[in-house]
Amino acid sequence: MYSAKNRFVQSVQRLQDFRNMYDYEARLATFADWPFTENCKCTPENMAKAGFVHCPTENEPDVACCFFCLKELEGWEPDDDPWNEHSKRSVNCGFLSLTKCVNDLTMEGFLRLEGDRIKSFYRKFSTVVLQYVEEEMTAATKRLLEYFSNQHQCSIDLDH
């Protein structure tokens, strides 16, 4: 089982990795081992256009995650439409509400969008962050108690 620290580190790494996923080609490149490639709606191209990144696990080879809202979907069927599945399960995703290409946004528009992406991350992973902080505080408290109990031990000689 992963500790809160491991989950926290993985979460932050995902946030950093996904900052490059505004680019369609970068998202598409993650689908090299995607199980659905032709004669279906959920092709790598359609998945990437809908904002998804391929995030397979050992047990689930078809896990896809939106780089923006971090919604993970698995159990894809050939007739599943990535846009429809995404919008049904993440109605407030900022990527889905874009009306123009990210490259056409003003700097202010892009920064606002990126701020929304980071807010999505913190909403999703706030419990992981809190668990990590609690574990660290517990460990620090234990170390302090051990330190002070060792430094201030009294020995009483009962023979004298």
UniProtKB/Swiss-Prot annotation:
Keyword set includes Protein biosynthesis: no
SUPFAM superfamilies to which the protein is assigned, alphabetical: Inhibitor of apoptosis (IAP) repeat
Localization terms from the record: Cytoplasm; Nucleus; Chromosome, Centromere; Cytoplasm, Cytoskeleton, Spindle
Post-translational modification: Ubiquitination is required for centrosome-targeting.
Keywords, sorted A to Z: Cell cycle, Cell division, Centromere, Chromosome, Chromosome partition, Cytoplasm, Cytoskeleton, Metal-binding, Mitosis, Nucleus, Phosphoprotein, Ubl conjugation, Zinc
GO cellular component terms attached to this protein's record: chromosome; chromosome passenger complex; cytoplasm; kinetochore; midbody; nucleus; spindle midzone
Domains (record comment): C-terminus is required for spindle assembly.
PANTHER family attached to this UniProt entry: BACULOVIRAL IAP REPEAT-CONTAINING PROTEIN 5.1, DETERIN
Quaternary assembly: Component of the CPC at least composed of survivin/birc5, incenp, cdca8/borealin and/or cdca9/dasra-A, and aurkb/aurora-B. Interacts directly with incenp (via N-terminus), and may weakly interact with aurkb (via N-terminus) to stabilize the complex. Interacts with GTP-bound ran in both the S and M phases of the cell cycle. Also found in a complex with ubiquitin-mediated signaling proteins including at least usp9x/xFAM, nploc4/npl4 and ufd1.
Protein name: Baculoviral IAP repeat-containing protein 5.1-B
Organism expressing this protein natively: Xenopus laevis
Protein encoded by which gene: birc5.1-b
